[in-house]
Structures are given as structure tokens and as C-alpha cells.
Amino acid sequence: MKLKMNKACDIASISVLPPRRTGGSSGASASGSVAVAVASQPRSQPLSQSQQSFSQGASASLLHSQSQFSQVSLDDNLLTLLPSPTRDQRFGLHDDSSKRMSSLPASSASCAREESQLQLAKLPSNPVHRWNPSIADTRSGQVTNEDVERKFQHLASSVHKMGMVVDSVQSDVMQLNRAMKEASLDSGSIRQKIAVLESSLQQILKGQDDLKALFGSSTKHNPDQTSVLNSLGSKLNEISSTLATLQTQMQARQLQGDQTTVLNSNASKSNEISSTLATLQTQMQADIRQLRCDVFRVFTKEMEGVVRAIRSVNSRPAAMQMMADQSYQVPVSNGWTQINQTPVAAGRSPMNRAPVAAGRSRMNQLPETKVLSAHLVYPAKVTDLKPKVEQGKVKAAPQKPFASSYYRVAPKQEEVAIRKVNIQVPAKKAPVSIIIESDDDSEGRASCVILKTETGSKEWKVTKQGTEEGLEILRRARKRRRREMQSIVLAS
């Protein structure tokens, strides 16, 4: 187990011994002046330069260093009072004492201490030097007191650091003891388990030996029993193999039965789906046929109403003469119609409806005998119809069938050519243009019935009323047809 040491408690960084002093004379001739300079030099500078590092030390070494320091200070004071030759001798003694202090045993011998050098101020060679004993004594006393205080401070810090080190070591020792106790407990439990295992192994070995002995005795006394046991074992093996084969066969048959049931259920479901689809198809076809018949009937009724409104507008004393071709709506393949327009006498255009196969009807329109210029009007979106105007006769080109899925609305205005009839009236009356358009808004179909006139007399009012009636009829037809289409879409 690793001991966690505190970095601040490094023993090598603690030192209680005083720093080593070094000093020397400049020569034999200037020994007096150097001694005076040493005596008058303040003690704070060398002491501040020499204090660098401290290590662990005992109280005896501290007392010894203090006694040495006091002796050195007394030697310095006496040196200042003696004459120059004596001072020289005492100065030599001071050097010896400093050397002796440096040779004291230190606890921090491992760490390198830096030696501070005392810089002595070289005074000018003056034979007369006055010395003030009172100032020197006070300065030396202050220096010694400061040095002692610093020593005590460093000693207290070193003791504090040593206490921290001891605390950390104590905590590490406690942790080590705790770990040792836990390890001892674990080892005791492991030993108990090992003992139990050894006893169980011994019992197992004894049981094996007993079984071997019993088997050997049984084989020796009854040799026929071994053959019987072998035959019984072979029979048991055969029975187990037959049971396994039977089990596999049963599983295979069960899987086949499940597959047949699944196939039967799928076939029944497919039959149900096909029957429902067939019924839906027949029902949709019947609904489509009925819808075609209803739409065609409604459309023919609306067209008859529009024609009646136009007749009421045009039936005046000075009736205008119109020319149009007789139109027949004949069912053709793909549900389209052919339109033939031929003139009819009596100034009217009656409509004759005759039932035809597939619920269709044939419509004959007989306009007046006199032929006037007539023009076809097509909406902007229509691209399939291409009219041909030749000498007042109009023929509509057949349209291309739409790509519808199930059904197509019975022949309406998109199958009948849209006619624009310009009616010429006698003088003093402006021509009236009647535009008959379909009620469907999709491509290839017109949207309304428009009557145009240029007069401001009573004829304008009549034509306006006819126009409004025709528009109202077309709106109703549109609404009815939209409702029927929505109901068909929802039912499908």
C-alpha cells in the first residue's frame, strides 16, 4: 500500500542550523582598517543573504547553534575595543569560530546549501578612524535579537511541517492497519472454505472407492448380470431411437395439417373476395347505366326548356328567319354521336325523340328554311373540335374519346356541336346573337347560355329574361349532376 506523503513536509527542505559565515582580510598592511570596517558593518545584510533553506533538527542542535552565535557576537564586540594587533588576532579567532560553526553536524547534509559571501566595503586608506562604541553596541544587539527571532520563526515553521508529516504518516499507518485486518479476515474465510472443500473432496473420493468395490464384487459374483444389463441398455437405446423417429413424423404431419388448414382458409378468403368483387362489378355497371340514363334524360329536358325559351324570344310578328341543319344524334361505337343539320320548313325547329337501343335517343332538330350565316363558338380550352363552315352549313368534327376508367357520361353538350346563330331582323332592329353552351366546366365543354343584343328597346328586355331563365336552368342541372356524381363516388 502506498503512503501518501505531503509535498510541503519535505524533510530535506528544513534546516535549523545557522548559515556559515566567510570572511577575510585584505592583507597584513590593512588589517586595522578592515577590522574597523568589520566592526562597523551592519549585521542585517550578511544575515539576510545567508538564510536560504532549513531542515529537520533537534533542540540540542538549536541550543548549540545559539551558544555559538552568542560567542561570535561577543568576540566581535571585544574585537572593537582591543588595539589593532589584538584585533587581528581576534579576527583570526573569529575566522576559526566561523569555520568551527560550519563544521557542525547538520541534518540536511544530503541537500546542497548555497554559501553567501560577505561583501566588505573597502574604505579609503585613512590612518585615523573614529569609532563610536555606543552605536556599534546597539546595532549588534538589534542584529542578534532579529537573528534570534528569525531562528525561532523558522523553528516553529519546521515543527509545524514536521507535525503535518507525522499526521500524514499516522493516517497512512492507520489505513495500512485497516487493510491488514481486512486481509486477515478474508484469509480466514478463505481458509475455512478450503477446509470445507477438502472435506467434501475426501468424502467424494471415499464414495468412489466404495462404488468401485461394490461394482467389482457384483461382477465377480454375478458375471451373467453384466450381459443382461448390456442387452437391456441396447434395447433401451433402440426404443429411444424409435420414439425419436415417431416424434419427428408426428411433427411433420402436424406441420402438413397446419399448412392444409392455412391453404383452405386462404382459398375460402380468395373465393369470398372474388365473389364480392364480381357483385361489386355488376352493381357498379348497373349504377353506371342508370346514371347514364338519368343524366341523358335530365339533359334532354333541360335542352328542351332552353329551346322553348329561345322560341318564346324569337316568336314575334317580325320573326327572324334562321337556317340550320337537321341534327341527328345516333349512337356510335365508344359512345359518341354524329350530328347532321338539315333545314326544315314552317320556321320552327321541332325535336323528335325516338328510343334507340342501349337507352339512347335520337334527336331531330328542324330549323327554318331560309339560310343565314351561322358560326360555331368553342371555348378557349377545347382543342379536339375543329368546325368547318361551308356556305352556311356547319359540321362538327368527331372528338377523341377520353381516357376514363369505368364509364363516361352519356352524350351531352360535348357531343353536340355548339352553335352560334346570328339572326338578321328587318331594318331598325339590331341583330341578336344567341350562344348555346353546355353546363360542364371541364375541358371541351362550354359553361353557359348567352343572348346578345345591341338594341335598347323592349326586345332587349325579352332577350335578357330568356338569358336569365336559361342560366338558371343550367345551374340547376349542374347542381343535380354534381350531387349524383358525388353519391356514385362515395358508393364506389
From Swiss-Prot:
SS bonds (residue pairs): none
GO cellular component, one term: nucleus
Single GO BP term: meiotic DNA double-strand break formation
Superkingdom field: Eukaryota
Primary location class: nucleus
Positions of short motif Nuclear localization signal: 479-483
Subcellular location: Nucleus
Quaternary assembly: Interacts with CRC1.
Function: Involved in spore formation. Plays an essential role in the establishment of homologous chromosome pairing in early meiosis.
Name listed for the protein in its UniProt record: Protein PAIR1
Name of the gene encoding the protein in the UniProt record: PAIR1
